[in-house]
Design a protein with these regions (language model features):
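Post-HExxH zinc-binding segment in Zn-dependent metallohydrolases
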Residues: 211-215, 219-261
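Catalytic glutamate of the conserved HExxH
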Residues: 198, 202-210
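C-terminal motif of bacterial Sec signal peptides marking the signal peptidase cleavage site
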Residues: 29-30
Length: 329
């Protein structure tokens, strides 16, 4: 029910040897900085009871502002008590619909839309420098040019992917730091319906992360340079998250759905990447969704919970009948 550019993405570290650079979407970690203080000059005027004179004095007061930032210096929005209550209710909703329980309260960061986009770009660039050895990116792009896959220079290709990071996501859950990140309106007491729908989706991923132990699982894959299990688990995870989000949206009445549509931010994303770049996303969100619906039809939510561990291969995601045959592929 969301277009390709609005698909809610479960971000991962860049894997330079996985699918020949098909997946270069990254979000790694977030932390809060110390609150900052600033000096504010306040002018005070004292009127002396006299017909001849008055005096003005200037005093300096230290005003403390409790503002938190992530590790890239991007502001994190405060969570009002009303938002926290909404978040608590959404946590309960996700637990009820999945039949699973959080081991610990999910971690989350709230940003403005611009702040969220800045975080996506900054975190990608941070990991890009760590993940690619000197000259490796240039050689990869040159190879793709030789095969006729792209016509971009290494620098232009990098710029396109960075912009894709900025604009293509409505919310995210990070496998490694286990933090849910969502852009919300600033200076509001309550989350609007659109924001809640995004949080429901990402809360499912947060729950999956705790139940499956995704952080350790992903770290082991990266250490062993073996990502064969990734497509199957990612597909099931997205299918389950889409399903629970769909449940939540289905409970809205007509007016609420109209409101939610009007609350959706402008996610314009005019970036055009090479066609092969989107192949994994078609696997996760399209074919994975089809497999997830079939599993749910046959075995309800218990079947999807089981599938988080009994992983399909990429071939079985494309051909669900092979998954249900229980034959090895």
């Amino acid at each position: 029910f969301l277009s390709q550019y609005l698909r809610l993405q479960l971000f991962l570290s860049p894997m330079r040897k996985y699918l020949n650079y098909l997946l270069v979407i990254t979000l790694i970690s977030s932390c809060a900085s110390e609150p900052e203080s600033r000096n504010q000059v306040i002018e005070t005027t004292s009127i002396i009871t006299s017909t001849t004179s008055s005096s003005t004095s200037t005093t300096v007061q230290k005003v403390k502002e409790d503002i938190s930032y992530d590790e890239f210096g991007i502001e994190l929005l405060d969570v009002s008590p009303e938002m926290k209550e909404q978040f608590d209710e959404l946590v309960k909703y996700v637990e009820k619909k999945t039949g699973l329980s959080f081991v610990e309260y999910p971690k989350f960061n709230l940003y403005t839309l611009d702040g969220y986009r800045d975080y996506n770009a900054a975190s990608y660039l941070d990991d890009f420098d760590k993940d690619y050895e000197e000259g490796e990116w240039e050689r990869a792009v040159l190879s793709e040019n030789m095969w006729g896959l792209i016509e971009s220079t290494p620098e232009k290709m990098k710029e396109l992917i960075v912009e894709f990071q900025r604009c293509a996501s409505a919310g995210s859950y990070n496998l490694l730091d286990q933090i849910l990140r969502v852009p919300v309106e600033k200076n509001q007491k309550k989350l609007n319906l659109w924001e809640q729908s995004v949080i429901v989706h990402e809360l499912v991923h947060s729950l999956q992360g705790q139940i499956v132990g995704l952080s350790d699982w992903y770290s082991t894959m990266k250490e062993n340079d073996d990502f064969m299990d990734y497509p199957g688990r990612r597909s099931i995870m997205e299918a389950q998250a889409d399903l629970v989000q769909g449940y939540w949206m289905a409970e809205l009445d007509f007016d609420q759905r109209q409101d939610m549509t009007s609350q959706r931010p402008n996610f314009r994303c005019s970036v055009s990447l090479p066609a092969y770049f989107y192949i994994p996303f078609d696997l996760y969100y399209d074919f994975g969704g089809r497999l997830g619906k079939q599993i749910h039809t046959m075995e309800r939510m218990e079947g999807l919970n089981k599938a988080l561990f009994e992983l399909p291969t990429a071939e079985q995601v494309y051909s669900p009948e092979k998954y249900f045959s229980k034959e090895p592929y």
